[in-house]
Amino acid sequence: MAAKEVKFGRDARERLLRGVDILADAVKVTLGPKGRNVVIDKSFGAPRITKDGVSVAKEIELENKFENMGAQMLREVASKTNDIAGDGTTTATVLGQAIVQEGVKAVAASMNPMDLKRGIDAAVEAVVADLFKKAKKIQTSEEIAQVATISANGAEDIGKMIADAMEKVGNEGVITVEEAKTAETELEVVEGMQFDRGYLSPYFVTNSEKMMVDLDDPYILIHEKKLSNLQSLLPVLEAVVQSGKPLLIIAEDVEGEALATLVVNKLRGGLKIAAVKAPGFGDRRKAMLEDIAVLTSGQVISEDVGIKLENVTLEMLGRAKKVHVSKETTTIVDGAGQKSEINARVSQIKAQIEETTSDYDREKLQERLAKLAGGVAVIRVGGSTEVEVKEKKDRVDDALNATRAAVEEGIVPGGGTALLRAAKALSIKGKNPDQEAGIGIIRRALQAPARQIAHNAGEEAAVIVGKVLENCSDTFGYNTATAQFGDLISFGIVDPVKVVRSALQNAASIASLLITTEAMVAEVPKKEAAAPAMPGGGMGGMDF
């Protein structure tokens, strides 16, 4: 086992603080509309330019093990905030640094670290309650666009695009961000439920120009197993032919005699039909077939529930206004499912999302939720160079997450103003002077984000903060982008409560741990062995 080095008390905390400062100083320059860029070296390819706090934090690894521990703990603040709210990483880092700096000073002045922590926790609770009280719910598309614009560092086109996407697919809908092949940034919306399975035979195509199958007002047969035997399929085919409607078959597979008969019927013009494989695998396939059944008001034909294919009636089939099938995808538009049943299914999936611990499962459940709840939108981010596209994609991701958070818990005035004003809520008293000091640490730390935003814009931070606090209106603040004081809500400068709250809670949580640290253990760095000496003697027989 390698030898370990141990640091105690003040020495340990000072080294932690040094690591915290190095990481925070690199991250905080990106805060606000006039935040600066950080250039990150990549071992291959062009350097990456970003204004995304968490991307900068992830790149920092320090040589000194004790300092690195401090940096990594602060990095945890940024990643945790990013996981919960998807934005606010830089604000969380700035708050974390401010709380740690003040806390380490207090501990050095012989205050009790545990009482400081109790004071900090009580103060954070009071501030979060105040933020919820002042939160304004988001209703209109304009408000959504404002939040997205701010989080995208003032890019109005991105803000509007995200607002359009959320309007079209609903707040629960899936919005994915991809890199475009062109210089333009564009939005594509897929209405209805789409899954990644195309037609099983090109002979089903009805639109030969686009190689698509378009079925109007079709019946939908949802079958869990393979279909290869024609006999069991005949009764339902005859019933559909008599109704004069098209038919979409979704099954594990359709092969052999069954597929051949369907193709022959289609070519002879007797039946407008298409067959596709069921989406997903294993248990997820069963769940997705159930989703399709709920959406189209049909039943999953499965021997598990005692329904045989030969006994199927038209009432058991699903219905939809339109179905489009391409070589790779199937889209069901406007299924005939009951609103109440769809909502019940949505609630069930939401409950599963809450319970799951796997990120992969959560992502797949969210996809299912979106397909049921409204549809899928894709924002394709374009740019002139690869570096520009990556930087813009970072901002679009941030903006999208911030917007979702805003819809969830509401908004408060932005630019660090909500936290500045929340200091008024700290009229609570600690049980002793050390707890009072903990409350005071948060009171001072709440000014840090507003000061940093002003500083990054080249303004005098103390003057800006002083002027904002002179005015008693909750929404009065400073617009750094235009260098104006006024009503921040009407300027459209707002922050999601979820982002501000998560930033403060995570910063205080990690900072409290750092303040109450009394010892640190790390491996002793290995000394590099000196390079061996060159063998002597020269090369015989060579005279110069």
UniProtKB/Swiss-Prot annotation:
Keyword Thylakoid among UniProt keywords: no
Annotated GO MF terms: ATP binding; ATP-dependent protein folding chaperone; isomerase activity; unfolded protein binding
Reaction it catalyzes: ATP + H2O + a folded polypeptide = ADP + phosphate + an unfolded polypeptide
UniProt cross-references to SUPFAM superfamilies, sorted A to Z: GroEL apical domain-like, GroEL equatorial domain-like, GroEL-intermediate domain like
Name recorded for this polypeptide: Chaperonin GroEL
The entry's keywords: ATP-binding, Chaperone, Cytoplasm, Isomerase, Nucleotide-binding
Quaternary data: Forms a cylinder of 14 subunits composed of two heptameric rings stacked back-to-back. Interacts with the co-chaperonin GroES.
Gene3D superfamilies: GroEL (3.50.7.10), GroEL-like equatorial domain (1.10.560.10), TCP-1-like chaperonin intermediate domain (3.30.260.10)
Pfam families named in the record: Cpn60_TCP1
An annotated GO cellular component: cytoplasm
Cellular compartments annotated: Cytoplasm
Enzyme class: isomerase
InterPro entries given in the database record: Chaperonin_Cpn60_CS, Cpn60/GroEL, Cpn60/GroEL/TCP-1, GroEL-like_apical_dom_sf, GROEL-like_equatorial_sf, TCP-1-like_intermed_sf
Lineage: Bacteria, Pseudomonadati, Pseudomonadota, Alphaproteobacteria, Hyphomicrobiales
CDD domains per record: GroEL (cd03344)
EC numbers on record: 5.6.1.7
Cytoplasm is among the record's keywords: yes
Function: Together with its co-chaperonin GroES, plays an essential role in assisting protein folding. The GroEL-GroES system forms a nano-cage that allows encapsulation of the non-native substrate proteins and provides a physical environment optimized to promote and accelerate protein folding.
GO biological process, alphabetically ordered: protein refolding
Binding site for ATP: 30-33, 51, 87-91, 415, 495
Major location category of this protein: cytoplasm
